[in-house]
């Protein structure tokens, strides 16, 4: 299974409050055998906080996590698909890019905590991360 990880998942896992970190890491462990996929946009969004505060330990934690993922580029075809998704749904720009990247790079599902994907009628599975509840596929 190829599983695209939304930025919020990594931020919860590595930079969230302790209870969010623990619950998110438990849920990620459930998908330990999956091929975790992130895009350059995920990398950028995750690094902003640690760069802003010059927190080298957090930077190292994120970069270490990235090394366990397949990092996919955002080709023009991905951006074109993101524009189509943005035009057809209520997704914000970054969310449309995440979904387009996941679809373009053959992911089976996208793991997120963002409710907006529920309304987008995504062409792939959407797994909602809920730190206080077990994950479940969205239909």
Question: Where are the regions that the model predicts?
Answer:
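Short, well-structured N-terminal submotif of metal-dependent ribonuclease cores
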Residues: 1-38, 50-61, 127-139
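Active-site neighborhoods of divalent-metal-dependent phosphate/nucleic-acid chemistry enzymes
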Residues: 70-115, 119
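Acidic, PIN/NYN-like endoribonuclease modules and their adjacent C-terminal/linker elements
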Residues: 1-2, 99-139
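Short active-site oxyanion
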Residues: 1, 32-36, 68-70, 104-109
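Alpha-helix N-cap/helix-start capping motif
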Residues: 8, 18, 40-41, 76, ...
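Non-catalytic, surface-exposed connector residues within folded enzymatic/regulatory domains
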Residues: 22, 40, 56-59, 76, ...
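A generic structural signal for short hydrophobic patches within well-formed alpha-helices
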Residues: 10, 43, 79, 117-118, ...
């Amino acid at each position: 299974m190829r599983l695209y990880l939304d930025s919020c998942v990594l931020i919860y896992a590595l930079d969230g409050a302790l209870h969010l970190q623990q619950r998110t890491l438990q849920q990620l462990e459930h998908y330990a055998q999956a091929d975790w996929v992130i895009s350059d946009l995920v990398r950028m969004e995750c690094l902003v906080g640690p760069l802003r505060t010059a927190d080298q330990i957090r930077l190292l934690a994120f970069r270490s996590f990235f090394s366990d993922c397949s990092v996919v580029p955002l080709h023009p075809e991905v951006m074109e698909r993101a524009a189509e998704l943005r035009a057809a749904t209520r997704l914000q720009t970054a969310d449309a890019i995440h979904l387009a990247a996941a679809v373009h790079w053959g992911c089976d599902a996208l793991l997120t905590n963002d409710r907006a994907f529920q309304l987008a009628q995504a062409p792939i599975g959407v797994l909602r991360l809920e730190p206080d509840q077990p994950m479940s596929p969205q239909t």
